[in-house]
Amino acid sequence: GGGLGHVIAGVAAHKGFNVSVLTRHPEQWNPSLLIENCRGNTFSGSLACVTANPAEVIPHSDIVLLCLPGFAIEEELLHIQPFLQEKTCIGSVVSCTGFFFTAYRILGKTASLFGFQRAPFIARVQTYGQKALLLGYKKELQIATVNISKSDILLRTLQEMLDTPVRMLHHFLEASLTNSNPLLHPARLYSLFHTWSRGKAYHEIPGFYNSWDEESSELLIACDNEFQQILKALPVRIEPIPTLLEYYDSYDARSLTRKIRSI
């Protein structure tokens, strides 16, 4: 029911795919989603089904895509597990949540899994269950798969569904270990609140991105440097996981600050 869930459902339905939404609040959803994108276009996608009952949608789904934060993945996998078919590909909109590890533990090591390295879109909900904003596309998406024999078909399907080029990674760790939100969020929160002490009150909500400062960028770069050293000790390729400065087209803390403030 978050921004990515709304936008991906609307985009895929608009492209002609049969899309169902499994949500705890089906009564708040319209049968058709309205999507406004960053290119000035507005379009709609008609949903095949919106329900809170996994038995109504999971058994006949070829692809199940979880658009959930990490803490909610285990509960949802347990919720849908009795209705999953052997042919079903189960994926996560981002893999840094620990999706592959949790899915292995719950569904077993023969489950057909896939996961995105980074979220496909920058997305926000405007009106829950009715309209969402697609605020940014990615130039390219990267996914990892496990136990999917026809991964080329899945890749082509996702490319068509999301209207974005998709590239296959070599190992699920290349999708699971990312230097995006798992580094960005802690670095920013630490820089905002490390001076807190008992009795200290904040009189306004600090801007997460729009007031991003160089202290946050310096800490983020330091975290990424350590992260890159960890990657070198693991059986993964470094090329699919660029440094944060490379990813954000920046060269130091000052330029990174300008870039992140513009998000």
Question: What are these model-predicted stretches?
Answer:
Residues 33-52, 114:
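N-terminal glycine-rich dinucleotide-binding loop that anchors FAD/FMN and/or NAD(P) in oxidoreductases
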Residues 1-42:
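NAD(P)+-binding Rossmann beta1-loop-alpha1 motif at the extreme N-terminus of oxidoreductases
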Residues 216, 223-263:
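Small-residue-rich helix-loop
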Residues 66, 70-129:
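Rossmann-like NAD(P)(H) cofactor-binding subdomain of soluble oxidoreductases
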Residues 46-60, 167:
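Short acidic low-complexity segments
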Residues 26, 126-223:
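Substrate/ligand-engaging "lid" and interaction regions
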